[in-house]
Amino acid sequence: MNYQKNKIYIVFYKDNFKWWSRLIKWWTNSNYSHCEFYDGEYLIGISNEQRVRMKKQPLNEKKWDIFELNVDIKTPIHNFYKETQGAKYDWLGILLSNIFNFHRHSKDKYTCSEWVSTIIDRELNIIVPKNYYQITPQDIYEILKFHKII
């Protein structure tokens, strides 16, 4: 796939390479275990490094579903990245909100889909309710498809 430098993509990890990918997909009844933004060169979000980061990485289309966003949110993504750079992964929030359903999460830590959905909703106001910490990668995919953003 040829990526355009002025475009932003949302990418969803669909491979079962790691055991936790299989577990997440099973637990969330989803096709995807992870999501991030991609600018054609860098992944932007929170992932294996357990912190918000930008990482130069080519994508294997057999492992990722890649969708061009038809809205321009490149600047908001980079602004939110600057605001949250280095923020850690919210493991406790996963346990308290998604496993035990206590609806607790950290205000300064994120899951991949929480980080992505925060930006999407700040700009487009399309996510209801605003419980970003409970949103899965599959939820984001379905919201973006429903609103014809991908």
Please annotate each region the language model reported:
Residues 1-8, 141:
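Protein maturation boundaries and topogenic segments
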Residues 72-76, 111-114:
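Generic recognition of short, well-ordered alpha-helical interface segments
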Residues 73-95:
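A structural motif
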Residues 20-21, 86-89, 132, 137:
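Generic secondary-structure boundary/loop-capping signal
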Residues 9-69, 96-107:
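Glycine-rich catalytic cores of cysteine/serine-nucleophile enzymes that process amide/ester linkages
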Residues 97-150:
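Activation targets extended, charge/polar-rich intrinsically disordered C-terminal tails
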